[in-house]
Amino acid sequence: MAAPLKAVDGNADRTGDLQALMSDLAARARAAARVLALAPPEQKNRALEAMERAIRSNAAAILAANAEDVAEARASSNMTASFIDRLTLTPARVESMAEGIGIVRGIADPVGIVTESWQRPNGMTIERVRVPLGVVGVIFESRPNVAADAGVLCLKSGNAVILRGGSDSFRSCRAIHECLVQGLREAGLPEAAITLVPTRDRAAVGMMLSGLNGAIDVIVPRGGKSLVARVEQEARVPVFAHLEGVNHVYVDASADLAMAKSIVLNAKMRRTGVCGAAETLLVDRAAAATSLKPLVEMLIEAGCEVRGDDVVQKTDARVKPANDDDWDTEYLDAIIAAKVVDGVDGAIAHIQNHGSHHTDAIVSENEAAAKKFLSEVDSAIVLHNASTQFADGGEFGFGAEIGIATGRFHARGPVGAEQLTSFKYRVHGTGQTRP
């Protein structure tokens, strides 16, 4: 067994020490990726089963580590309630983490699947086969559960992963990572298959973005706008961009009001700090007289601040005026911007101008309007008569997700095990030569 990685402390030759540390862990991860690429599904599933057990049996230690992280965050005056919510683990959330590992274990192994096969006129058979990406670098901020989600999804898809969690969740991630390593060890897989960067030093992020001399094949950022922007600007390897969720719910004139109220309330208030939370409510002008006031009152009475245009402000004195920035803001809090638009075309135009290509929903009983919305809104996830909070890999049946990719290349939407694979072509011949 290789010696454990040593954390970088102090200031003496810090950059040199950190570079050596990162180069070492990258080399170990690359070696582990070669082993994982050939690991049979049964061995990977044994590791996942052991990880699930370890999370449950070490729940108290995970929660204790998280309590220290949360206490430190609360002592900082600039941490919002939504940030604290994303950072906080509860017994139910730890159990959900374990259950997610079990679900990932139960899904089909994507590696080695022949997605397409055909025979050429010369008798050669060509197969397109799923293969792992290699080494995935995951850079995330406050959510400690990302360590588990990313670790198990990369394992399932035959990839090694280097995890760099936020400094705010450092202790929590370390406790979770120990459980994942225990599972790898019990299954006889290399411990470097899931590596946690053992330092809070922010310079480690820049080193990962450099690709660590070709050791990292793809970067997945999970965090706020500034993190994602930095990754996209500095990364020298491909990026699965997880942009902010400026998500919209459009209530069409044909919408059932009871359904609309239920969807809007859930989309905004179920958990305000998740990337699938609705941030803007759009209401068809033709429904304003009947639907707007009930929707606004419902949100305010649920504890949500509503910032509206002139029409919305007239429905309730408690509505605050919206400014131009509100239409582009991911609040991650109990705040929503609200606007009246001219039908589905007006909603689509607003989303095109202000959306983040993440998740947008229409509430409508008009199939033509719904079809138009689903076709023309250029977001990774578009929903008809359902809450935006279904923007989640677990809800898609992926077991978990490594992020919601909002770009257009390779992966889009929830990134599960299958999306963490590429492909190669296998060609079978009987001695053919090209004329």
From Swiss-Prot:
Predominant location: cytoplasm
A biological process from GO: L-proline biosynthetic process
Compartmental location: Cytoplasm
Pathway: Amino-acid biosynthesis; L-proline biosynthesis; L-glutamate 5-semialdehyde from L-glutamate: step 2/2
Residues passing through the membrane, by range: none
Enzyme class: oxidoreductase
Assigned keywords, A-Z: Amino-acid biosynthesis, Cytoplasm, NADP, Oxidoreductase, Proline biosynthesis
EC number from the UniProt entry: 1.2.1.41
PANTHER family with a match to the protein in the record: DELTA-1-PYRROLINE-5-CARBOXYLATE SYNTHASE, GLUTAMATE SEMIALDEHYDE DEHYDROGENASE
Family membership: Belongs to the gamma-glutamyl phosphate reductase family.
UniProt name for this protein: Gamma-glutamyl phosphate reductase
Gene: proA
